A protein has these predicted regions:
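NTP/phosphate- and nucleic-acid-binding module
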Residues: 1-482
Length: 482
């Protein structure tokens, strides 16, 4: 089979986005070897390539978390039911999703343990022991862990019973300080997702109906997928003093009086990997942002005659010497696959840059580069690789963000009334709809009941929504979502 035939067959095996986006997504997750199903209900295995993406995301986000003064810790996976029940709104919000441990070995436990759905309860209990004085504040902790939420309908990365995340939990002496923390960490998420994942974000406040169980306020970063649905990329919660009063988290202030602390929590999960797939992917598979790609550039040696093998292989070694220290590089010299097959494998897996090296390239002392985002080709001299390849990766990162931003702009509609919002979604149109919102629960409930769309957030940045501002109203973004 020729390279062209192999490419055609490989591409034909992948469903087009326009035909069935959901099926396309599942096929890409499988073909790109990001994840696979397991015998455990609702739980996936994240394969090495998918976990490699998560490792780079974790490294880049963890750096930002620590730069804002936070430290990492680890709290128990199991949470006593009695602790969860102390905060009524919290337990009511998570009870349908809790998985319970009822036996230890062959003995029935006296008290059930919830497998961690989130950690506010156990952390609140421990903070009540650790915090004594205003000198102990603020407490700024983060943990990287897995959580379990017993989902009825699951989809790899987007909604699974078990997933990986980070959750930050902080305690402060004053409400303004806690509020500052909430907004600071929301900005960390926005900047991280836009800079490293190349995904444009709407940041804003959730409505009361959509806020986290037990929180005073919830803030969110929202992204738009290629099928026109929104995805929540991370949340930051102002917990007020609810958990402090429930778990008796107090401190002695400078005047010697006991005061309740003010708390926050914030988190982001592996569903961001799903967002990368759905924002940047195309009909050939993944298109990974270079900043989080496990392999940023792949070298494909090309030879047809045995006598060319050693020459090409020797030149490939020189390429690795030039750029191996500045990019995450892979050399694919497998004999059992043709160059055409390899091209399509790495297109499917979203490797940002392909470097082709054949006898003609060796003769000209250059490498042919092929971008995954645009398929543009460029011959780069060996001596220039160490500067040009990182520059190309930066261009690809910026290009992916620009394409995603243009798509979001084209699929963000302004509506002047609730009726226009409903009409938009009833016509099966996609994307975000911005509209004046009177702040009532009935407004968003009617939109949700009639269309399935929810109020995603009240955005901070109104630069593109100025025409919608009304006295007594706030601009709100509506969308169908994951």
């Amino acid at each position: 089979m020729s390279d062209t035939q192999e490419k055609k067959q490989f591409v034909e095996d992948l469903t087009d986005q326009a035909d069935d986006f959901s099926r396309w997504y599942l096929e890409v997750v499988r073909k790109a070897q990001l994840a696979d199903y397991t015998p455990v209900r609702g739980s996936m295995v994240i394969r090495p390539y998918g976990y490699g993406i998560w490792e780079h995301m974790q490294r880049l986000l963890d750096r930002r978390i620590k730069a804002t003064g936070h430290e990492n810790a680890y709290f128990p996976l199991l949470i006593p039911e009695s602790l969860l029940q102390l905060e009524a709104d919290h337990v009511e919000g998570f009870a349908p999703e809790c998985a319970w441990v009822t036996e230890g070995g062959r003995e029935k436990l006296e008290e059930r343990y919830a497998i961690r759905p989130t950690s506010e309860a156990i952390i609140g209990h421990l903070y009540s022991r650790w915090i004594e004085s205003y000198r102990d504040l603020p407490v700024l902790l983060n943990q990287w862990c897995n959580v379990m939420r017993w989902e009825k309908v699951t989809r790899p990365f987007l909604r699974t019973s078990e997933f990986l995340w980070q959750e930050g939990h902080t305690a402060h002496a004053s409400e303004p300080e806690a509020r500052e923390e909430v907004l600071r960490m929301l900005e960390v998420y926005r900047e991280f997702i836009e800079t490293e994942l190349a995904i444009p974000i709407f940041a804003g406040k959730k409505s009361d109906a959509e806020r986290f169980a037990g929180a005073d306020e919830t803030y969110t970063v929202e992204a738009l997928m290629r099928d026109g649905k929104a995805l929540q990329g991370g949340t930051s919660h102002h917990l007020g003093q609810h958990f402090a009063k429930v778990f008796d988290i107090t401190y002695q202030d400078e005047a010697g009086k006991r005061q309740y602390v003010w708390q926050t929590s914030w988190g982001a999960t592996t569903r961001l990997i799903g967002a990368i797939v759905m924002v940047h992917g195309d009909d050939q598979g993944l298109r990974l942002p270079p900043n989080v790609a496990p392999v940023q550039a792949v070298v494909v040696p090309i030879w047809r005659k045995d006598e060319d093998r050693a020459v090409v292989r020797g030149f490939v070694d020189r390429v690795a010497q030039e750029i191996g220290a500045v990019v995450r590089l892979k050399i694919d010299d497998r004999d059992q696959y043709s160059p055409g097959w390899k091209y399509n494998e790495y297109e499917m897996r979203g490797v940002p840059l392909r470097l082709e090296v054949g006898p003609k390239d060796v003769a000209s002392q250059a490498v042919m580069t092929v971008r995954r985002d645009t398929r543009a080709k460029e011959s780069v001299p060996l001596a220039a690789l160490a500067t040009r390849v990182p520059a190309l990766l930066a261009e690809i990162q910026a290009s992916l963000f620009q394409q995603a931003e243009e798509f979001r702009s084209q699929n963000t509609t302004l509506a002047g009334s609730k009726a226009e919002v409903i009409a938009h979604f009833e016509a099966d149109r996609r994307g975000f709809v911005a509209a004046p919102w009177d702040g009532s629960a009935s407004f968003e409930a009617e939109v949700k009941e009639k269309t399935g769309a929810t109020l995603r957030c009240v955005p901070f940045d109104l630069s593109r929504f100025g025409s919608l501002e009304r006295p007594g109203h706030r601009v709100a973004l509506f969308a169908r979502s994951y």
